[in-house]
Design a protein with these regions (language model features):
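Unchanged
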Residues: 114
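Domain-scale signature associated with acetyltransferase and cell-envelope carbohydrate enzymes
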Residues: 1-111, 122-126, 131-144, 148-151, ...
Length: 157
């Protein structure tokens, strides 16, 4: 029992430090699942991902090209959830996401068929594969919202 608590505490400290390195933590009392993470790339910085008080994260927060992600107070991001931003995803206070929710403010791929054809001929690290080349629009989810398992919310929602 004591070893389990110690192990859980060490996992929390490790996750807390990973999140602190890649996101702006503006409060306290966080819970991070073992598979949770923040990914910032293509010019994004920790200032682009803001996590408020009493937030539970069991999924992934992904920002590219300065895409903003803001999680309000007492928000829960369920297991295997993905928030993928190249523009802006704002989740207001007291919102809960069940497991396997995907929220993407972009199409993850270019709209133009000719650009997609070009993209398919490049390496998986090529700039053409970045979300900034896809259609994108901000997403705002208000206060006290519950998102059910496996919905997909896309740009402009």
């Amino acid at each position: 029992m004591i070893l389990r608590k110690l192990f859980d505490y060490l996992i929390f400290i490790r996750k807390y430090n990973q999140f602190k390195r890649n996101a702006t933590l503006t409060g306290d009392d966080y819970k991070f699942g073992r598979a949770s993470y923040v990914s910032i790339s293509d010019g994004s910085s920790k200032a682009d991902v803001v996590i408020s008080d009493h937030v539970w994260i069991y999924g992934a927060l992904q920002s590219q090209n300065h895409g903003k992600i803001h999680l309000g107070k007492y928000t829960k991001v369920g297991v295997d959830c993905k928030l993928q931003s190249v523009e802006s995803i704002i989740i207001d206070d007291y919102t809960t996401m069940a497991d396997n929710v995907v929220i993407a403010d972009n199409n993850n791929h270019p709209v133009s068929p000719s650009f997609r054809l070009y993209m398919r001929t490049t390496s998986d690290t090529d700039d053409s594969r970045r979300w900034k080349h896809s259609a994108h629009a901000p997403i705002y989810i208000g206060k006290i919202v519950g998102l059910v398992k496996m919905p997909g919310l896309t740009k402009g929602s």
